[in-house]
């Protein structure tokens, strides 16, 4: 019985001394991995909901990038795209205001 307790204690201590981490923290619905610095082929995501904390980025490997294209696309904001987006928003708002609901009487 003493040898069993000793063996258990040794394994518990060795688990604390392992240089690597047996638990790799995942992010973005288990697609990405939390790292301090992403590799050149990986896409990094700096969103607060990615659950990596302030010091780490969510790194998504290139082979898994197709699973979440909306989050892993590098976008460039230019002046023309901003103007186009504002124009689209104004047109959408104007068309929605013209679709005001008409009152319907409950008696039919």
Curated annotation (Swiss-Prot):
Keywords: Antibiotic, Antimicrobial, Cleavage on pair of basic residues, Defensin, Disulfide bond, Fertilization, Secreted, Signal. Residues 21-63 are annotated as: In vitro binds to LPS, mediates antimicrobial activity and inhibits LPS-mediated inflammation. InterPro entries: Beta-defensin. Disulfide bonds join 27-58, 34-52, 38-59. One of its GO terms (cellular component) is extracellular region. It comes from the Eukaryota. The keyword Iron does not apply. Its main location: secreted. Residues 1-20 form the signal peptide. Belongs to the beta-defensin family. Highly glycosylated atypical beta-defensin involved in several aspects of sperm function. Facilitates sperm transport in the female reproductive tract and contributes to sperm protection against immunodetection; both functions are probably implicating the negative surface charge provided by its O-linked oligosaccharides in the sperm glycocalyx. Involved in binding of sperm to oviductal epithelial cells to form a sperm reservoir until ovulation. This is Beta-defensin 126. It comes from Pan troglodytes. The gene is DEFB126.
């Amino acid at each position: 019985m003493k040898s069993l307790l000793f063996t258990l204690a040794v394994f518990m201590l060795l688990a604390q001394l392992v240089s690597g981490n047996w638990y790799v923290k995942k992010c973005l619905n288990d697609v990405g991995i939390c790292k301090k610095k992403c590799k050149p082929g990986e896409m990094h995501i700096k969103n607060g909901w990615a659950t990596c904390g302030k010091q780490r980025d969510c790194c998504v490997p290139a082979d898994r990038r197709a699973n979440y294209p909306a989050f892993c696309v590098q976008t460039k904001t230019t002046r023309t795209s901003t103007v186009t987006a504002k124009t689209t928003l104004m047109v959408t708002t104007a068309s929605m205001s013209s679709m005001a609901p008409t009152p319907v009487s409950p008696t039919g």
